[in-house]
Design a protein with these regions (language model features):
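C-terminal structural segment of proteins
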Residues: 1-172
Length: 172
């Protein structure tokens, strides 16, 4: 069963809390991040979002999707039937095709946005039937491309904590 989360208003948009923290809904489009007055001082975030894929993709892609995307390699990007022949670590197999002889998966993480958000000390807020869970964004990325996210959890939003002093950042 698939359920659309598109209509959940709290998962869209960018706002500033009374504490000064910036909240970015997981369904906020990357183009919205680059055009936001609230995020104007976050130069590295704006630059990273503006470099993701093409303008057409940035108009559809969300910040939540970008930070939670799968790691990829040439092997993993093949058809399901082809990958089943001799699975890699990520698919329960015993090898990494990206780097032969590696004892673990070394597929590359593709997000441009996640490293920038981690540099700001961002937190990820997940929701499920059990409630809400807030964790440092950096802590959700585990070995072999896995993420510390339960199957019933949905990324609700990201929080950039209020910074003391002048914020200076860059992304190239």
């Amino acid at each position: 069963v698939y359920v659309s989360i598109e209509g959940i208003k709290d998962m869209h948009g960018i706002s500033v809390a009374d504490s000064g923290d910036v909240k970015i809904g997981a369904l906020t489009k990357l183009v919205e991040v680059t055009e936001s007055d609230i995020l104007a001082d976050f130069a590295a975030l704006n630059c990273a979002c503006s470099k993701v894929a093409s303008p057409q993709i940035r108009n559809q892609a969300t910040i939540g999707g970008n930070v939670l995307q799968e790691t990829r390699c040439i092997y993993f990007n093949q058809s399901v039937s082809w990958r089943r022949i001799n699975p890699c670590f990520k698919l329960g197999g015993d090898r990494c095709y990206q780097y032969k002889g590696s004892p673990k998966c070394v597929a590359l993480f593709q997000s441009d946005v996640a490293p920038v958000m981690m540099s700001y000390g961002a937190e990820a807020v997940f929701v499920s039937k059990s409630g809400e869970r807030k964790v440092p964004l950096a802590s959700i990325y585990l070995d072999a491309g896995k993420k510390d996210k339960a199957k019933d959890e949905i990324l609700s939003h990201l929080i950039i904590p209020k910074h003391k002093g002048k914020l200076v950042s860059a992304y190239t």
